[in-house]
Amino acid sequence: MPQQKLHVKSGDTVVVISGKDKGKRGKVLRTFPSEQKVLVEGVNMINKHTRATQENPQGGIVEQEGPVYADKVMVYCSKCQKPVRTGAKIDDKGNKSRICKKCGVEL
C-alpha cells in the first residue's frame, strides 16, 4: 500500500474532532505517515511503566502522549477560532503554502 501524505505537519495547532479527547487543542509533536498517526501535546495520555535503570533508579509510572489517527484531528485557524480544512495556494514565485478554506489566511 503506498504511503499517503498527512494533512497536518509537526508544529501545527490541531483540534481533536472525535473520541475521548474530543475538543482538546494541542500542538503536533511528531507525525507517523506510514501509520497515518500523529502525536499531539496533551492528548491521548497513557501511563508507561518504566523499569528502574541507572539514570532513573526509582522507576515507576510515567504519563506521556500516545499517537492518535490523523483523521481524528483538524488544523486550528487562529483567525477563525475554529478547526478548519486547509487548501493550497501557489504565489507568483511558485511557492506553495497552506491556507484556511474559510477565511483564506495563510497557516
Swiss-Prot record:
Pfam families, per database record: KOW (PF00467), ribosomal_L24 (PF17136)
SUPFAM superfamilies: Translation proteins SH3-like domain
Signal peptide: none
GO biological process: translation
InterPro entries found in the cross-reference section: KOW, Rib_uL2_dom2, Ribosomal_uL24, Ribosomal_uL24_CS, Ribosomal_uL24_KOW, Translation_prot_SH3-like_sf
GO molecular function, one term: rRNA binding
PROSITE patterns the UniProt entry points to: RIBOSOMAL_L24
PANTHER family assigned: MITOCHONDRIAL RIBOSOMAL PROTEIN L24
Description of how the protein assembles with itself and partners: Part of the 50S ribosomal subunit.
Family classification: Belongs to the universal ribosomal protein uL24 family.
Protein's UniProt name: Large ribosomal subunit protein uL24
Organism whose genome encodes this protein: Natranaerobius thermophilus (strain ATCC BAA-1301 / DSM 18059 / JW/NM-WN-LF)
